[in-house]
Amino acid sequence: MQTFFWHDYETSGADSRRDRPLQFAGIRTTLELDVVGAPVMFYAKPPRDAPPHPDACLITGITPQLAEREGLIEAEFAARVHEQLAVPGTCTVGYNSLRFDDEFTRHLLYRNFYDPYAREWEHGNSRWDLIDLARMCHALRPEGIVWPSREDGTPSFRLEHLAAANHLQQEHAHDALSDVHALIGLARLIRVRQPRLWDWYYALRRKQKVFELLDVVNMTPMVHVSSRYPASRGCLTVIAPLAQHPERSGEIIVYDLASDPAEWLALDDDAIADRIFTPRADLPEGVTRIPLRTVRVNHVPALAPLSALQGVDTPRLQLDLEACRRHRETLRGATDLVAKVCRVFQQASALPPAEDPELALYGGGFLSGAERKSLSLVRATPPEQLGECAAAFRDPRYAELLFRYRARNWPETLDAEETARWQAFCTARLTRHTALTKLTLDDYFARITELRSEPAAQDKLALLDQLQVWGEQLT
């Protein structure tokens, strides 16, 4: 049976590698969006080796004391999350989930000895994300839905704003289960108002379909909707696919045809790279970014042929199709363009070595088949015997991950030497800025003090008091 599993996390911060999920909620539906079974919602105990970000706690209202009281140890939390997401035939869906929730899931599973990726594709499973469908709907087929605006007049795609504007069920924004109810309400609205667009975007969760659309041989122009384009343009542009990424087979290098390529085509590789990868704020005054980027075929990119623009108010999107056509012809006439672009992206593709195993999900390679079996062995081993499992892995990441897995979940099973090692690790992480630590306890307390003086936080002083107490317990 094919089903959707609509889900959401509330977390201790925005960094999926360093921060932690504190709440998970989900609802399973049929593909027709009829609810199947009861909703799920549970908390995770907060880690003792890292404080939560005070701002995140103010947004969610989840204090570490609540998570500690109601939550599961992370090993059990990960098992329950995986149990839901790995059901055969499941398409997991969220709102900005490909960039946020799924990254938290991958790192959660990685830390807790699951294959971080298998649940995404095995047994007919897939991933989807409603946020770019909402953007696509606003840009191409806005009829039948109320689109809220920000103060500057640009569209807002925040779930709570869309829910309020369209009278969708959402009792408490930034409560995971309430957000899931709002998400399903938005999905039903889009599916009813724009069924053809719904079906089109649903098909794009299969990467082969995306590959078929991105024709690099002819640089066939495609409509692309993404948060990487300004909201003032409806988050929409027309792109030209140029080449497959030389190192990452699942990425296609594309160019934003709204910009004239003539002024950079004669630059050398280094100059082009500087204008692609240098942070915008660090570019010299008057120098603009070159809008070369990649599209990830497994991230459900919001693509459509130019025919989708028929009947669309293109001036509303600040889209000049004639200029896009000219810019494509300029690209097609450029000598050695593809080779040059591939060299630039190849030089920039190497990931720096991770300085800590918890940061090495993407930089450490894939496990062998035997080591994947060892993941199941670790999860099945009684906590008091886990220390014996370290020899099952050749991958150097996993010996340290195993020690932290034991220490965070079952500290009572550590011997005296291991306990001292764990306490030293926690002290270092709480007191010093390292690759793994971006928020020390001093930073945490300083931010609480700052928030106490901010007008917007005056009704949250009791929550800030609880955060202060929690930090003092960690010292």
Regions found by a protein language model. Give the residues of each.
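Extreme N-terminal starter segment of soluble prokaryotic enzymes
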Residues: M1-F5
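Short acidic, Gly/Ser-rich segments with clustered Asp/Glu that frequently serve as metal-coordination loops
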Residues: E10-R17
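Metal-dependent phosphoesterase core characteristic of DEDDh/y 3'-5' exonuclease domains
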Residues: R18-F24, R28-T29, D34-I62, E83-P195, ...
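Metal-dependent phosphoesterase signature
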Residues: I59-F77, Q84
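Acidic catalytic cores of enzymes that act on phosphate-bearing nucleotides/polynucleotides
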Residues: Y202-L283
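Long, charge-rich C-terminal accessory regions
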Residues: P246-T427
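C-terminal non-catalytic accessory extensions
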Residues: R421-T475
